[in-house]
Each structure stands twice: as C-alpha cells, then as structure tokens.
C-alpha cells in the first residue's frame, strides 16, 4: 500500500511540474516581446515532409542529408502506458532542384527497427563516405532490451542522388548508457558520442494493444519523458557523458562526465583535430583537442559561452565556421527584450527559433544571427549553404529555408 501511495505522490508531483512547464508561457508571456531579427532581407519557404527531420548535415554544396524520426505515439495498454514509433528514414535534399528523396537502405536487416537521429560523415574520397547514424532501436517484441545503436553505412555519390549500403552496427544497452544524443566520426574506426541517462518507460507495445484513451497525446514531444525530465532537472539527477569508441578494437572510453546535464550536439574539425560539444542548458560549447597519436583520447582546452539554447552544431570545413540551430522558450526573452528594446513593431511571441554562425578564425565571434517567430517549432539543426539557410525540427514536419531576396 505504501508503494502505491509513493507512486501516486510521484505522479502528482511530476504532473504538477509538467503543468507549470506547459503553462509557463501563460504566466510570463504577457510581459515579453521579441522582434524578428535579420530576416527583413530574406524570404522563407517551408517544404512539406512526411515526418519530422530530426537532424541535418551538409554533404556538399548540392546535397543535404537528413534523418527522419517519427514522434512517439502514446497509448494505454493493459499493463502500462507505452509508445509505438513507426520506422523513420534517411532523406536526401537536392539544393539545386529542391527535391527531397527517401533513400533506400541497401542490405539493412528488414526486421530491425530504424529510428534515426544524429548523423556524422567520414570522407574516404570525393565520391565515397562512411555515414554514421544514431538509431533509437525500440524492440517491440522484447521491450526490456531496448538498444541504442550506431549504424554504419557506405555512402556513394551519384549524379542526382546517393546510395547507402549497410555495413555494421555498434550497440549499447539503454539500461546502462541511456540515450545517445549525438555522434562525430573522427576517422573510419573512431567515433565520439554523447549520452543522456534519464527516466524512460520500461516497455513499448504495438498499435494492436492500443486503447485509444490517450490518443490525444500523439506527437506530444515525448510527453511522459518530459514529466520525468522536469523532475530530474529540478533535483539534478540527469547525467550526461562524452565517450569515444574504437570500432576496430571494440573499446569505449569515458572522455567527460559532465558537471552539467546537457551534453548534446557534436561536430569535428578534422584539419585542426578539434571536437566541439554543445550544452544547451549550460549555454556553452566545449572544445576538445583530439590526440593525433591516440584519437580515442581528447583534452578539454576551451569553453565558449552561448546566448541561446543550441541542440546541434555543424562544422563547415569549406568556410571554417560553425553553424547552429537555436531555440528558446519564454524564459529566454528577458535578455532578448533588453537587447532589442529599441526595435519597433515588437510582436508577442512565446517561443522562437533561429540560426547562429560562429567564425572560428575570429575567435569564435558570431558572424551571422537570425531570430524568428517559429515558422518551424523546436529547431534542432541549421545549416548555411551559400545564401540559403536550412532549418529542421525533430518535433514538426517540414524543411524551412531562408533565402536572400
């Protein structure tokens, strides 16, 4: 009986925090305004997509590679609340003809779930790459053995498309490592990845077991996870790590046990052997120097403070710049209002998105910034190609493009 009472109390506490989180805009939103910054000379286009594009990287000046990840659908079953997620995919966006194509995964095991998120490339030659993909592999047949997998594909560039051939997999138990958030390929054998350990539901069931009671929660941004994440953040229970993995030796090394709670996006500067790791809650970017002799080892050498929340970053070796998609809630707007209070025609806004460009050769100064009311909510990635800036979101369908007028 005491256990049941404890469960009920925990449930009410998490619901209370979730209610405050979801309604904080109502409490604070009337006091703050945000003007759209640096978009007067740009026009935007929203390209419809089948599913949300959770992550995006640049292959070259012609192609973007995107991971399509379906949001969980939440159902009630005879035993507990559970999720079911349809398979996602890898999409190729052709910048020249504005075509978005779902790429076939050659030789990929048909029975293996595919829920891709983070992406990273290693260049073999001008036409051939290894593509590494985070796969949140939810096993509906054996739900207590959910795995986080990193899939390795051989990517070959063709005239108007690419081919992806499945090679092999590195898997991690969710029970011990939590969720893999981002990856960066150092060479063809060494990868770095960030993880986040947090509360998660013990089981997943198929749609055949649905009761329809919680259908209104579909695509609710990991609704149950949000409840527990809020509680864990309040008591500093969430932990994040940075690891390296040697694909050939099968060895894992802990590089950083974060003092904060949000090790997220990774990007690698191969020329200078620098690894960038963003932490949205702490609002900074950690810079590690990768050992040239032992690339599975890294040393923290610098920290850059950021103004906004950043989920993922991309290092553009052609321009020696870092691109970041930014997002924010009502809590960020105090600083924004103070910064832009002299602007005219402020519009009320509850959330915002945007883009930041860091110029590495000028000591990581911000060389371009865009802020806008969310035409696309929950920005997870942003990349600049020539005069166009591309935005993706893991929560909302669509590819948003800002172009010079």
What are these regions (language model features)?
Residues 50-59, 86-87, 108-123, 171-190, ...:
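Beta-rich, blade/repeat-based domains predominating
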Residues 66-85, 133-146, 193-236, 325-350:
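Short, conserved, GDST-rich strand-edge loop motifs in beta-rich repeat architectures
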Residues 378-405:
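Blade-level signature of beta-propeller repeat domains, shared across WD40, Kelch, NHL, RCC1
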Residues 307-372:
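Loop/turn-rich, solvent-exposed surfaces of beta-rich toroidal or solenoidal domains
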Residues 104-124, 128-187, 194-229:
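Asp-box/WD-like beta-propeller blade repeats and closely related beta-sheet repeat scaffolds
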Residues 94-98, 155-162, 246-250, 289-294, ...:
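Short loop/turn segments that connect beta-strands within beta-propeller blades
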Residues 26-52, 102-104, 163-167, 364-371:
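A short helix->beta-strand "capping" segment at the edge of beta-propeller domains
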Residues 43-88, 377-378, 395:
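Beta-strand-rich domains and repeat architectures in extracellular enzymes and scaffolds
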